Amino acid sequence: LGDRWPEVDVRLEMLEEAVEVMRALWDGGLTSHHGRHYTVENARLYDLPEERPPVLVAAGGSKAVELAGRIGDGLVSLAPAEGLLERFDEAGGRGKPRYAEVNVCWAADEDEARRTAHRLWPIAGMKGQLSQELPVPSHFSQAAETVRVEDVVETVACGPDPGAHIENAKKFLDAGYDHIWFHQIGPDQEGFFGFYEREVLPRLR
């Protein structure tokens, strides 16, 4: 709420400390914590879960992936980048679940799907760590103006061809992800569900 946008190393420190506080609260009783980033005085959860909820850590870069392996109960990622899951395993993630979000844009017309993906999800075409470093929405809007349709469709399967969607999903399965969810970019959710139920999911099982 108005704080500065810290550099990535500080954000990861904050995440690790926040997870520590969350788990202490889930263990029950009064919790006090005096850390580098957070202070908690005599906090308590009165309605406790029957067991600790799993903490899935989202990560894309090497430092975040190593943190996810060390403190997380699982990994969430957006890219089948080479070596990512190996680093996760080496940091303590071996045997933990790996979730991938796969961006897709189904529409009956491929050109329409490409335009929709570019209009609604230009972040998919931003290179490197740019999207993680922009602190305010206006910066996202400015960066989005530099993204081309071709940049977005490099990572987003678009249109009605099931082969393109299957090929896109298999990149994540082949990389070692064991859970995938598909994010439909665009308004036709019913059409997307029907297409995946009939044409895509049976060929991925």
Task: For the regions a language model picked out, list residue spans one by one.
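Active-site-adjacent structural elements that line small-molecule/cofactor binding pockets in enzymes
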Residues: 1-205
